[in-house]
Amino acid sequence: MSPEDVVLCVDIGPEMSSEWAGAGPGGTASTRMRVVQAALRGFVRRKASFNPKASRCLHRFAVLALDDGVTVVRPLTSDVRSVFEAIDRLQPLQPPEASSSPVAEGGEDSDGGETPFDFSELLDCIAERFPPAKDPLSSVTERNRSSGGSGGVRGAEAVVGATSQVRPVVRALVIYGRSFTCPVVPPTGAEKHGLLSHWRFFLDCLYFHRKPSDEGVICGEVFDSIATMETSGGGGHSYFLECGHNLQRLNVNMAALLAHPYQRDYQDTFFDKIAAPGSGAAGATPAARLDNNANAAGGLSNSTANGGASSGVPGSVGGLTMI
């Protein structure tokens, strides 16, 4: 299986500085950003440990910060320690000072002082800084064409050499945390570089949000908007997950994201396999799941990434081999 270049794209908007409503890691009070940082460190540590016989980490990681734009905090590296340092350097922006307008629960304006994030900027950054490898056969064909089409034995050797090289899959893992404004999402197929349809690129998202019942919160609309960015290449599948303030849900979601995109099931199928009997609407649409649990503090649904599964992260989850 090909290695992965995992681009960790972390929202540092003001909402990420809000208090985590439940107990954080270790049972202590924490902020949303600190909980996310702990979860990402665990993800990187476990992902890097899946090939213990190798002399170095099979996978590489990069860290991006998302505010009004995109900042590359750490370029791709297999040095896990430097990835941890980059994750720990992430600091959420401070919320704007309260105005005289009505204030929603949590002490923020009705829109939370948020700026809608433009996902086109993120896709442009990834296409420029972390582009997935081109099809090796197409590059060999182009060289043969430019040399007049005389391939012969050398041309055949080039094809064998190109196809034997193991090229990484590029996966963007987006941690998004804005509950009051819908992001700007490019229409399907409209991104100029065709990244979402590239067979070596995958986009996953873990959405952190406030309680759906809080004033001004539109987390259902936000989640549905993000979920339109389904990647269609390579036979793999994007995962779009969510978490309110439920640490068990977060742990299970992070475990699901460990699996290689080429190996994992469709999202609903995966969570159906690990859900508790009678847990409900794992296969529902995001909006339907929100309606089913509109006042839940834990998230948008009762079943997605929950359902009594272990909060540990084993070497395999739901029958998947983690590499």
Regions found by a protein language model. Name each.
Residues 1-170, 180-183:
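Von Willebrand factor
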Residues 17-21, 48-58, 73-76, 96-99, ...:
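Intrinsically disordered, low-complexity regions enriched in proline, serine, glycine
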